[in-house]
């Protein structure tokens, strides 16, 4: 039985409580939130013990789920790492890349598992399509979020686009050679439509588009590689492959295509990644998504956000 505590009572924290309670091998020992009112409300609603400070919670738990931004709990994270506790991070954002580099060095001295939330990697549609991904030459990620759901105070790059960037880097396994970003403000002080482009050293190009002023919600990924295109619907958890066959010279009918619907078993990616965290702890193995992977995606996202900020004021 692994004793686990939660830092942060925001939406991620509330959801984490529900998920962890469904995993019998975890024993939820309590939570901490810096907001006294939210702490009291969540304690009553979830019938869960709340701690008065994060250090006390970290001290009694074997594992910590940091549901809020890492920048809110740096000391608790350092304590957990020094004591070789296991840590699950929902948001690795620390405000500064230098702080994250320091934390990366600390992790090297720890015997604990540190996993970063990347639910898209656990999406059943992505998992069904992944074995067919070889060497994509072009990738296209599109995401539409209803305005009321996204709000207008969040950074589209750091809140949403960063996860798609992680997927692209995971699929290519290549360093980024060049990047660009643009944005348009329609109804908010921040850009409501963002487009980004990454060019990798292996020749692959990834384009990203995110829009938070549409009425409909969608999240898709298209991969183009020799002989096929792969379409992944991350929202509806569907995936298909379009096989392309060149009929050869002299045939005027053009390229022949056939579509294959992949078998996808619907699941909850958030619950699956938490179960993966438990498995990594139990088997003493490296997590699927570690802090080094998250740092690379965060670093490029921060660079894109900085350039987007500059464009917004010029």
Which residues does each PLM region occupy?
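N-terminal Rossmann-like dinucleotide-binding module
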Residues: 1-45, 310
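Short acidic low-complexity segments
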Residues: 48-60
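Beta-strand-loop-alpha-helix segment that lines the small-molecule cofactor/substrate pocket
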Residues: 63-70, 74-118
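A contiguous active-site-proximal alpha/beta segment in oxidoreductase catalytic domains
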Residues: 94-151
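C-terminal glycine/acidic-rich active-site capping loop/insertion
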Residues: 119, 227-292, 313-314
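Contiguous beta-strand/loop segments that form the cofactor/metal-binding neighborhood of enzyme cores
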Residues: 162-238, 271-283
């Amino acid at each position: 039985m692994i004793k686990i505590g939660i830092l942060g009572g925001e939406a991620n924290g509330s959801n984490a409580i529900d998920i962890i309670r469904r995993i019998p091998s975890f024993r939820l020992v309590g939570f901490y939130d810096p907001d006294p009112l939210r702490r009291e409300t969540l304690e009553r609603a979830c019938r869960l013990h709340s701690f008065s400070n994060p250090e006390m919670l970290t001290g009694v738990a074997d594992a910590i789920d940091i549901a809020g931004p890492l920048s809110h709990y740096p000391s608790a994270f350092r304590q957990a790492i020094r004591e070789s506790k296991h840590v699950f991070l929902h948001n690795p954002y620390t405000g500064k890349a230098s702080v994250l580099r320091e934390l990366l060095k600390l992790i090297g001295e720890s015997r604990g598992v540190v996993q970063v939330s990347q639910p898209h990697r656990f999406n059943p549609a992505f998992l069904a399509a992944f074995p067919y991904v070889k060497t994509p030459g072009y990738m296209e990620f599109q995401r539409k979020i209803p305005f009321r759901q996204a709000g207008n105070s969040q950074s589209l790059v750091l809140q949403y686009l960063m996860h798609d960037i992680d997927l692209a880097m995971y699929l290519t396994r290549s360093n980024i050679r060049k990047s660009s970003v643009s944005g348009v403000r329609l109804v908010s002080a921040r850009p409501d439509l963002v487009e980004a482009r990454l060019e990798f050293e292996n020749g692959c190009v990834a384009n990203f588009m995110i829009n938070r002023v549409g009425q409909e919600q969608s999240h898709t990924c298209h991969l183009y590689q020799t002989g096929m295109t792969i379409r992944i619907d991350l929202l509806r958890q569907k995936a298909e492959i379009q096989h392309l066959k060149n009929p050869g010279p002299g045939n005027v009918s053009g390229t022949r295509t056939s579509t294959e619907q992949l078998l996808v078993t619907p699941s909850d990616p958030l619950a699956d990644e938490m179960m993966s965290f438990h498995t990594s702890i139990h088997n003493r193995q490296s997590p699927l998504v570690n802090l080094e992977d998250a740092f690379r995606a965060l670093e490029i996202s921060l660079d894109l956000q900085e350039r987007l900020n500059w464009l917004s004021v010029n």
